[in-house]
């Protein structure tokens, strides 16, 4: 077995997994369906968490007993947790900028690559953490600043390499679209090929480096966006992932007792042999995924990063079918949008459902834009 889920607490541990999974799915729906929900979660709750964490750390620095013994200070003080929560939340805000066309940046062509950049940063944070364990404790173990015993070894290297490969499994960086009612930022080229490779890599990362949290962040936290992405939110997996990751990280930063010290707490078996098997699976999955992407790119004759490689596939078409009507986008586009920005939005939105092989939008000057686009927007 991968986890110690036996004994008197087993019913609570399984119930906790189901509770976390359900809560993440529900909170994701709340955050994605309206501007209020998204702003409440990623501005309001994040601000409250920041104030709380600063208060705890300032209190600890001043020697206050309540702060020195606070679980946020004792159990969540590593660089990784703070880097992860703010990187994930930055991703959520950036995705909202894209789907709501907020500001010049949110409507810029270059900003369509933001999802790739922020996901790559999040992956690199975990890769560094994996390599940290390998360097600190090769074929042995070390105790983190949070008091967690971590093994180190070749499995960290295997999974670190898997994470680096996973970054190159993200294709069609500029193929970002807006869903009906502007509820989702869609990335149709991010299909099951990437999702499976990512989930296996990320599960392995949590198993290697977060053994006290992996039951929840390695299972429930990965299942929540994947279930939504497979069943009702095609093309929106990466937004689901960012939203649920940010919310989970904020919860753990403020209530770490749930996963560390309660009846719901679960430890992995923390066995290097098991770590190695899981890491090899993650590495092989990412090698296969990247190989398949290279194959499709060569078959279509496209650059897999500047252009989409899964055009014509079932998953790609289902995601593209969820795009908002052009008329709705024109009606809801901010009045500050320029004709050039509107023209780009329309060009993306009127691509066929199956996509267009080799499509790469060329940014135009305002003088080249048909004024009819601007007229339609204001009707």
How would you name each of these model-derived features?
Residues 2-102:
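An N-terminal, globular interaction/scaffold subdomain
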Residues 15-24, 83-99, 159-174, 221-226, ...:
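Hydrophobic cores of alpha-helical transmembrane segments in multi-pass inner/ER membrane proteins
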Residues 29-40, 100-110, 230-243:
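Membrane-helix interface "capping/anchor" motifs
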Residues 105-235:
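Generic multipass alpha-helical transmembrane bundles of integral membrane proteins
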């Amino acid at each position: 077995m991968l986890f110690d889920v036996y004994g008197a607490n087993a019913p609570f541990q399984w119930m906790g997994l189901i509770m976390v999974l359900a809560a993440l799915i529900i909170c994701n729906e709340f955050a994605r369906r309206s501007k209020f929900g998204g702003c409440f979660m990623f501005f309001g709750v994040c601000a409250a968490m920041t104030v709380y964490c600063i208060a705890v750390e300032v209190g600890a620095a001043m020697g206050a007993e309540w702060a020195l013994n606070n679980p946020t200070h004792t159990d969540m003080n590593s660089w990784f947790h703070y880097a992860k929560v703010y990187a994930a939340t930055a991703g959520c805000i950036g995705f909202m900028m894209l789907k709501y066309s907020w500001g010049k940046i949110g409507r810029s062509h270059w900003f369509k690559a933001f999802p790739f950049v922020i996901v790559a940063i999040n992956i690199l944070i975990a890769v560094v953490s994996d390599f940290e364990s390998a360097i600190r404790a090769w074929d042995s173990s070390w105790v983190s600043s949070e008091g967690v015993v971590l093994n180190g070894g070749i499995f960290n290297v295997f999974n670190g390499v898997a994470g680096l490969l996973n970054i190159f499994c993200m294709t069609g960086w500029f193929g970002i679209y807006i869903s009906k009612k502007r509820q989702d930022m869609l990335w149709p080229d991010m299909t099951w090929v990437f999702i499976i490779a990512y989930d296996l890599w990320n599960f392995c990362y949590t198993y290697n480096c977060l053994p006290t949290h992996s039951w929840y962040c390695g299972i429930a936290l990965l299942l929540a966006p994947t279930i939504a992405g497979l069943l009702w939110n095609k093309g929106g997996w990466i937004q689901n992932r960012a939203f649920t990751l940010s919310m989970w990280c904020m919860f753990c930063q403020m209530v770490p007792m749930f996963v560390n010290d309660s009846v719901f707490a679960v430890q992995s078996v923390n066995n290097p042999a098991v770590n190695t098997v899981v890491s090899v699976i993650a590495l092989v999955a990412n090698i296969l995924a990247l190989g398949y992407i290279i194959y499709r790119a060569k078959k279509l004759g496209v650059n897999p990063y500047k252009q989409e490689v899964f055009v014509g596939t079932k998953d790609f078409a289902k995601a593209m079918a969820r795009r908002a009507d052009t008329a709705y986008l024109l009606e809801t586009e901010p009045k500050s949008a320029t004709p050039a920005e509107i023209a780009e939005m329309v060009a993306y939105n009127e691509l066929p459902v199956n996509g267009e092989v080799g499509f790469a939008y060329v940014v135009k000057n305002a003088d080249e834009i048909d004024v009819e686009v601007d007229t339609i927007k204001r009707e």
